[in-house]
Each structure stands twice: as structure tokens, then as C-alpha cells.
């Protein structure tokens, strides 16, 4: 099949539409502070998009690259399209923010500027300024003897235009850097938040004594944060990475956000020194630095403005009184997070660290929280003399410094730490525990779609799979040998790994379904679909009558509902949990269910070490089948992709189905039912039965 550029949706525009769906949550009937969270998430996503994707396009344009995507849009065309899209969407962001803050005021929760406070609260702000703000802010003069300062990525500042009180004709420009140690808002009372820049503006003349404030403008800068590391030339990768992190802080400016109606001379002053293209200047009529809205959304006094807090549940066959190794030895176990608890994953490593029969623990780490109980358990195990091998991916973007910290701590404890594979990121999520019982070695494995991160496990939907099967023991051992040693053979037998093998396997399974024509069925859930070879194979399958359902949260470059894709339906689910699981079903493959750490993107399939895990266990397959069926029935959180690249909400029917809420309710129902039953085998059977029925 011959493909053409118009058969693909542009990757960058598809991502922007994903982020628009995040912002669209503000239009739904959600608690107000939940809407505020979605604004914070939307703005955080946009920060990273500019730091990496827009910065990359600017570099391609500067290098004279003409085409960089399957749709053959040039870097310049993409940059123009991105700017147009975001300048239009900025108005929607402003509208949602104003609507939400107005509704919050009706609930007696306020964001107020200094000038709108009563005298008593102004005095409290004044006291706070002199005790907490004044000692740490940095006043900066810019003139012939004071060069324009270095501004950190995502730094928040106040630009000022001032004049000498004795000589008003002498106008000067400077800025007040607001350090990150200060909160975004001063909580002047239990229900009133004052933007920090509002207080700083009020006291600008005390910061620059002898000068009169003529104008000020809050602004925020975004820099290129992508790092290029010459791994081939690195003798000490950790040192090279630390140097790269320092250089990241000096990346080129790619965006300037500034308050609307700012003094023209201030805007010119900033543009002159930063050399930012005027289309990359975004003027806002609302507050800047909105990722910090989490500070308000976390207000414990207004919990009625938040969704009810759900507590993940641990279901049989896991039991707090039963060894996790005994449970996994009896059967394979699959859990769906965060509806089911992440605790068994932690217990798997914690128990291994304390078990005298355990001789080896191996694990990959990609994104780890700052205070990780899992890593602490690994440190304890290494300190006790167990053989601990940990692959810490130091190139995990924006987690590099945290991962460096843990890598050093693990090394100091005696663990064997692998920093990465030259030219690749290790994105696979796998751990292996080896126990010696008598003269036999027993293997226990955990394979997952998500990170070993207890914090993100509460808000990301992922699938975890525990097994002790010999074929998984063989392949995970081979995988860790590939990571720690020299190996030209990067192929496994039961598991599939990338680079190359996962893509080959996926294409092979698509071809099998294609050969079955109208009998073929493919259901695939992932974060993003970009790979043009896989998209082409899906088009060919569709033309042969294969029914294809894709559940893709983020980027989708496939264009549905065309002559070549009339049997392909694409939906995206956006809810309070971030859909992160990768689950694939191919009707005529054996086995026909798979979970993976990899999306169908070139970076995952060609430039990362990933794993795809076949699911043989019948109970686990039934659980995945119900999970996919539920998501395909969702008519609350789901959007459908049209052939013009736009997404439409799926209309609700008589039966309202919110897939995330439904899973919360049914896992809770199973948990409550099981708490009444003390018979372990009956409880396990009932859990499976209830999940399937529900």
C-alpha cells in the first residue's frame, strides 16, 4: 500500500489537541478545585511541550531541515501552526480561569490582589513581605555596568520601569527575581490567596530605594531544556550528565509569557535582551505561572470542592498475612492500578530485601519519587549483602537529578548500578527476585506498564503482572544480562524487547489479523500512536475488513474514517487518572493479550529498551478483556477522533458509563464483599467472578 502525507495527522498538532482535551475538563460538571487542577496540568504540559518539542522544531528550522514528519510539514510550517493554535486557545484558558475563580468566590474562596484587600489584610501582607519575601528576592539593575541577568527556565519575575526621584528624566529598567523557595500565593487567611507578585509590586520602591516605580509587569520565561549528550565519547557518563544538566539551564529562550497591557517599553526591554520572536510572546489577562494552582487546589478546608478521595484496594490472592512469593508461586496475578493498590509491588521488593532465602534482586528504575520506599528497600538489601542490580535510567527527562541522587545512594550501599545503554533509554519496567531453596533457584518476576513510583501509581492507570513461570525467568535473566554486560543478541524468546523485536511482533500480529479479513479483531490501548509502518499496516488491515478499536490518550497520527481506515475507530479517555497502560489484543494470535511499557512510536520501538509481555493466564486475560470492554463503553470521559484531526465527545446514552468511576466502585464492592469472607480460595474465586460480572 502506497501512503501519502495526507494520510497522517501531524504529531505536534495531535498533541495540542490532546492538551485541549485536558483543558476541556473545565467545561464538565466537575468540582471546582478539580477544574483548577486541570488548568494546572494543562499549563504544565504546555511548558514541557515548549521546552522540548517547540525548541526542537526551532533547532531543525535553524539547521535548514525541510521535512521532519510523516505528514511532511516543514519545521517552519509546524511552528506557525502551533503558534496560531495556542494564541487562539489562550483566550479559552483565560475564560475558563475567570469562570472558575468567579465560581470559587461564590464558595468563599478567593484569589485577591493586594490592592483589593482590606487594611487589616494589607498589613498582614506587608509584614509577610518584610519577614519572608524581602530577604530572599533578588533586585536586578540592567544598565551599562549591570548586564542582563541569566534567567532560569520557567523562572518567574517582575520587570520594572523606574526613575530617579531626584531626576525623573532618568528612566531605568530592571527586574525583581522571585525565587522558587517562595510559594506562588500568600495564604493571607484560610480562604484568601494573594499572588506573590502583587505584594512585590506594592513594595517595589522599597526594593529600589530612592527610585519611583513607573510600571511593572510579571513575566515568565521558557528555555530549550532538551539535552544532547555525546555518550560515545563519555568515559564517565554520570559526570557528563551532570554537566549536561548545568548546560540545560542556559538553553535558548523559546517563549515569553507576560501580563497583558504591559508597558510597551518594558516589553521592548525584555525582547531586546532575550531575542524572542514576537509570535512566541504570549500576553495574558490572567495570572501567570498557573502550574502553581496546585497550591490552592490542595486546600484542606474546601474538600467539598474536590472529588471524593478513593483509596486503592488490595484484592486476593494478595493478602497481608500471606507471603507475596507464595501467592505468585501458586498463580500469575494481574492488577489494574490505581483501582487496585500498588502495595503488592512495594511488598514484592520489601519482602525480598528481608527474606534470608533471597540471593538476588534486579530492577529497572525510570521515574522514581524523591522519597522512595522501594529504592530504600533496595538499599537495605544491598547493605545486608544481597546481590542487587539496578538499572537507573539517568536520561529520564526532568528526572535526571533525582535519578542521579538514587544511583549514588544505591552504589554507596553496595548495589551494582547500571546507568544506561549507549544510544538508548531503558524504559522497560521489570524486576526479578531469585530465592535459593535448598539446591534450587526460584524466580519471581514483576512486569509493568508503569513506573516503580508509589506517588504516580495513585493517579496513573497501569497494569502490573506477577509471575514465577520459567519462560519469564529465562527472558528476564537474559534482559538483565543485556543491560549489565556486552551482548549483540538483543532478542528474547517469550517476551519481546525493543529496539526492533516489539515492532516486528506487532506487525506480524497485525498481518495475522489482516489475513483473517472480516474475522480479524484488534484492540490496542496506549498513550501515543506515531509509527508510520504500524499505521500503514493498520490501514491495510482495515481495508481487508479487520475491526480495529484504538484507545489512545495522547498523540494519534492515524487518520480514521477514510476509505482506507473505515473500520478503525479511535477514542481518547481523559479523566482524573492519567491513562498510562499499554494493553494489546489480537484475536487470532496465541497468546492474544499483551501488556507493554512501549507506545507505538519510533522512539519506543527503535531508540529505547522496552518490553512487551504476553499474558497466558486465563484469569488475567479475562480481566484485561473486561478492562478494554469497559473503556470502549465509556461515554463520559471518552472522545472520538474524526478524520479532520479534531475530537468530539462521545454522546451519552441512557446508561452513563464513566470507566474510571466504574472501576473504583466495583473494586470497592469486591473488597467489601471479600472482607466478610475468611475462606481464601472462595474469596479469590469470588473476586474473579465479581470483576467479570461487573
UniProtKB/Swiss-Prot annotation:
Role: Catalyzes the reversible transfer of the terminal phosphate of ATP to form a long-chain polyphosphate (polyP).
Residues the record marks as active site: 427
Reactions mediated catalytically: [phosphate](n) + ATP = [phosphate](n+1) + ADP
UniProt entry tagged with the keyword rRNA-binding: no
Database matches in InterPro entries: PP_kinase (IPR003414), PP_kinase_C_1 (IPR041108), PP_kinase_middle (IPR024953), PP_kinase_middle_dom_sf (IPR036830), PPK_C_dom2 (IPR025200), PPK_N_dom (IPR025198), PPK_N_dom_sf (IPR036832)
Cofactor entry: Mg(2+)
EC number in record: 2.7.4.1
Protein name: Polyphosphate kinase
GO biological process: polyphosphate biosynthetic process
Sequence similarity: Belongs to the polyphosphate kinase 1 (PPK1) family.
Gene: ppk
Superkingdom field: Bacteria
Molecular-function annotations in GO: ATP binding; metal ion binding; polyphosphate kinase activity
Binding residues for Mg(2+): 367, 397
The record's account of how the chain is modified after translation: An intermediate of this reaction is the autophosphorylated ppk in which a phosphate is covalently linked to a histidine residue through a N-P bond.
A GO CC term attached to the entry: polyphosphate kinase complex
Keywords: ATP-binding, Kinase, Magnesium, Metal-binding, Nucleotide-binding, Phosphoprotein, Transferase
Amino acid at each position: 500500500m502506497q501512503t501519502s502525507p495526507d494520510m497522517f495527522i501531524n504529531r505536534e498538532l495531535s498533541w495540542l489537541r490532546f492538551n485541549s482535551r485536558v483543558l476541556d475538563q473545565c467545561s464538565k460538571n466537575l468540582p471546582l478545585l478539580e477544574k483548577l487542577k486541570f488548568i494546572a496540568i494543562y499549563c504544565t504540559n504546555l511548558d514541557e511541550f515548549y521546552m522540548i518539542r517547540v525548541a526542537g522544531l526551532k533547532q531543525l528550522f535553524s539547521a535548514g531541515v525541510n521535512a521532519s514528519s510523516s505528514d511532511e510539514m516543514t519545521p517552519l510550517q509546524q511552528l506557525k501552526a502551533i503558534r496560531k493554535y495556542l494564541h487562539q486557545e489562550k483566550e479559552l484558558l483565560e475564560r475558563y480561569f475567570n469562570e472558575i475563580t468567579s465560581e470559587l468566590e461564590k464558595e468563599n474562596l478567593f484569589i485577591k490582589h493586594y490592592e483589593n484587600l482590606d487594611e487589616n489584610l494589607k498589613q498582614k501582607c506587608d509584614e509577610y513581605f518584610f519577614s519572608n519575601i524581602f530577604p530572599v528576592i533578588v533586585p536586578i539593575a540592567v544598565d551599562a555596568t549591570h548586564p542582563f541577568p541569566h534567567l532560569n527556565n520557567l523562572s518567574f519575575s517582575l520587570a520594572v520601569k523606574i526613575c530617579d526621584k531626584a531626576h525623573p528624566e532618568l528612566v531605568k529598567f530592571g527586574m525583581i527575581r522571585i525565587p522558587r523557595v517562595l510559594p506562588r500565593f500568600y495564604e493571607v487567611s484560610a480562604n484568601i490567596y494573594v499572588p506573590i507578585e502583587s505584594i512585590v509590586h506594592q513594595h517595589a520602591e522599597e526594593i529600589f530605594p530612592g527610585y519611583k516605580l513607573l510600571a511593572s509587569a510579571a513575566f515568565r520565561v521558557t528555555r530549550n531544556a532538551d539535552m544532547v549528550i555525546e555518550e560515545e565519547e563519555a568515559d564517565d557518563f554520570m559526570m557528563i550528565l551532570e554537566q549536561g544538566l548545568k548546560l540545560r539551564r542556559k538553553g535558548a529562550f523559546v517563549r515569553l509569557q507576560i501580563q497583558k497591557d504591559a508597558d510597551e517599553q518594558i516589553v521592548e526591554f525584555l525582547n531586546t535582551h532575550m531575542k524572542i520572536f514576537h509570535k512566541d510572546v504570549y500576553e495574558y489577562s490572567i495570572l501567570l505561572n498557573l502550574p502553581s494552582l496546585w497550591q490552592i487546589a490542595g486546600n484542606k478546608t474546601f474538600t467539598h470542592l474536590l472529588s471524593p478521595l478513593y483509596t486503592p484496594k488490595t484484592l486476593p490472592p494478595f493478602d497481608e498475612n500471606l507471603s507475596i512469593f507464595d501467592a505468585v508461586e501458586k498463580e500469575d496475578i494481574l492488577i489494574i492500578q490505581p483501582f487496585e493498590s500498588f502495595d503488592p509491588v512495594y511488598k514484592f521488593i520489601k519482602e525480598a530485601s528481608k527474606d534470608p532465602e533471597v540471593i538476588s534482586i534486579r530492577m529497572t528504575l525510570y521515574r522514581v519519587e524523591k522519597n522512595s520506599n522501594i529504592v530504600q528497600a533496595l538499599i537495605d538489601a544491598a547493605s545486608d549483602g544481597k546481590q542487587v542490580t539496578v538499572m537507573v535510567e539517568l536520561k529520564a527527562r526532568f528526572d535526571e537529578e533525582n535519578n542521579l541522587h538514587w544511583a549514588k545512594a544505591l552504589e554507596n550501599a553496595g548495589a551494582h548500578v547500571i546507568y544506561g545503554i549507549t544510544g538508548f533509554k531503558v524504559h522497560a519496567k521489570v524486576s526479578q527476585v531469585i530465592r535459593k531453596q535448598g539446591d534450587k533457584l526460584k524466580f519471581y518476576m514483576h512486569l509493568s506498564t508503569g513506573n516503580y513510583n508509589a506517588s504516580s501509581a495513585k493517579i496513573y492507570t497501569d497494569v502490573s503482572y506477577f509471575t514465577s513461570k520459567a519462560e519469564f525467568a529465562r527472558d528476564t535473566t537474559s534482559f538483565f544480562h543485556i543491560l549489565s554486560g556486552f551482548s549483540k543478541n538483543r532478542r528474547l524468546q517469550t517476551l519481546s524487547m525493543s529496539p526492533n523485536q516489539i515492532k516486528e511482533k506487532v506487525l506480524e500480529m497485525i498481518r495475522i489479523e489482516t489475513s483473517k479479513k472480516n474475522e480479524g479483531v484488534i484492540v490496542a490501548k496506549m498513550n501515543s500512536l506515531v509509527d508510520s509502518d504500524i499505521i500503514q499496516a493498520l490501514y491495510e488491515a482495515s481495508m481487508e475488513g479487520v475491526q480495529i478499536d484504538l484507545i489512545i490518550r495522547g498523540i494519534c497520527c492515524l487518520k480514521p474514517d477514510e476509505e482506507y481506515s473505515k473500520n478503525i475507530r479511535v477514542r481518547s479517555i481523559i479523566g482524573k487518572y492519567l491513562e498510562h497502560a499499554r494493553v494489546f489484543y489480537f484475536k487470532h494470535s496465541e497468546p492474544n493479550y499483551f501488556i507493554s511499557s512501549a507506545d507505538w512510536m519510533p522512539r519506543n520501538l527503535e531508540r529505547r529498551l522496552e518490553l512487551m509481555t504476553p499474558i497466558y493466564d486465563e484469569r488475567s486475560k479475562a480481566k484485561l478483556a473486561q478492562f478494554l470492554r469497559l473503556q470502549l463503553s465509556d461515554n463520559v470521559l471518552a472522545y472520538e477522533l474524526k478524520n479532520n484531526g479534531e475530537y468530539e465527545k462521545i454522546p451519552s446514552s441512557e446508561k452513563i458509563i464513566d470507566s474510571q468511576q466504574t472501576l473504583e466502585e466495583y473494586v470497592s464492592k469486591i473488597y467489601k464483599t471479600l472482607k466478610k469472607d475468611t475462606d481464601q480460595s472462595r474469596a479469590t474465586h469470588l473476586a474473579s467472578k465479581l470483576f467479570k460480572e461487573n
